[in-house]
UniProtKB/Swiss-Prot annotation:
Pfam families: tRNA_Me_trans, tRNA_Me_trans_C, tRNA_Me_trans_M. One of its GO terms (biological process) is tRNA wobble position uridine thiolation. Its EC number is 2.8.1.13. This is tRNA-specific 2-thiouridylase MnmA. It is found in: Cytoplasm. The active site is at residues 84, 176. Belongs to the MnmA/TRMU family. CDD domains: MnmA_TRMU-like (cd01998). The lineage of its organism: Bacteria, Thermotogati, Thermotogota, Thermotogae, Thermotogales. One of its GO terms (cellular component) is cytoplasm. One of its GO terms (molecular function) is ATP binding.
């Protein structure tokens, strides 16, 4: 951005207290850690850029962490990084940056912006448009994603040529607020119950005992029972405290319902496009009906482990995001036809 002639101010987020990293063992690289703050200061100093450290620990706790805990209490599998982009990075932080008199916000995310639309990055393996699809449409005009035209190796080589010390730094992998990656321990500390119950198959046969429904997600294979065939989590019955498992073929579905919608393009009643339901899943051709603030999605081929709480992003044929939302349930439950 400096090469293009912009006056640059750097901003660095602190989402959790530094003390957390002193009490928890860091299993993998996470963002927003004390080492990241050190690196941000060093890079800003190298290029003579003012660095502002923005503390959002309280609002992060009240929004992202509470959402994460509450979703598990509901038996769902949340996606905190998706909502962090909307509520924190391009919410609280964006507002602060604009209030400070800046015109644009440039971030290192891998995505493209063209003609007011959010597109997948040139480097499809590192593409982050899936997580960025939560950003409100009216905010896209403030954003710049310089990395979107490059792949990761090209960015690392540019950083190396500029003698930036973090050119070979590993990517962030785990949640910043659970640096030891012990999700079970974190949830237990925060009041999520883990009441044991029965594991059954679709015919009602008892196969074993589960360790609390919040400990499992749809499609999970390692469920701690000895059976001849591989079994996968199909659903969680919270009323009866039952974990229902089945064969792999039973985990696939081609219809599901999506709510809490964020539109990045004008949409009418019907959409033809491609849907992605997990970051590492491929997009699947689909048709979508919009009705009463919900999407009713039907895919051309069945998708493995459609999981309530996870995110569905619909793309057009050019790779631009049309709409995103939260997966509520498999099936359509009352909505039966596109006609």
């Amino acid at each position: 951005m400096k090469k293009k002639g912009y006056a640059v101010t750097a901003y660095h987020l602190k989402t959790v207290p530094d003390s957390l990293y002193l009490t928890k063992q860091i299993k993998h690289k996470v963002c927003c850690s004390p080492s990241d703050t050190f690196d941000a200061k060093k890079v800003a100093q190298k290029f003579g850029v003012e660095l502002k450290i923005i503390h959002v620990e309280n609002v992060f706790r009240e929004t992202i962490i509470k959402y994460f805990i509450n979703e598990y209490k509901r038996g769902r599998t949340p996606n905190p990084c998706f909502f962090c982009n909307d509520w924190i990075k391009f919410g609280v932080l964006l507002e602060r940056i604009i209030q400070d008199g800046n015109d644009y916000v440039a971030s290192g995310h891998y995505a493209l912006l063209r003609d007011g639309k959010l597109y997948k990055a040139k480097n499809k393996e590192k593409d982050q448009s899936y997580f960025l699809a939560s950003i409100k449409r009216e905010k896209l005009g403030y954003l710049v994603f310089p990395n979107g035209e490059y792949n990761k190796d090209e960015i690392r080589n540019i950083a190396k040529d500029l003698n930036i010390h973090i050119h070979s730094k590993e990517d962030s992998q785990d949640l910043c607020f659970i640096p030891d990656n012990n999700i079970y321990g974190f949830l237990k500390e925060n009041g999520v119950g883990f009441k044991e119950g029965l594991i059954i198959d679709t015919k009602g046969n008892i196969l074993g005992t589960h360790k609390g429904l919040s400990n499992y997600t749809i499609g999970q294979r390692k469920i701690g029972i000895a059976v001849r065939e591989r079994m996968y989590v199909l659903r969680k019955d919270f009323e009866k405290n039952l974990l229902v498992v089945g064969k792999k073929g039973e985990v696939f579905n081609n219809k599901f319902t999506v709510s809490k919608l964020n539109f990045l393009q004008d949409v009418y009643k019907k959409i033809e496009g491609y849907v992605k339901v997990r970051k590492k899943f491929k997009e699947v051709k689909c048709r979508v009906y919009v009705d009463n603030d919900n999407l009713y999605v039907e895919t051309r081929e069945p998708i493995f482990a459609i999981t309530p709480g996870q995110i569905a992003v619909i793309y057009d044929e050019d790779g631009a995001v049309i709409v995103s939302g939260v997966i509520e349930k498999e099936g359509w439950n009352g909505f039966e036809s596109f006609n």
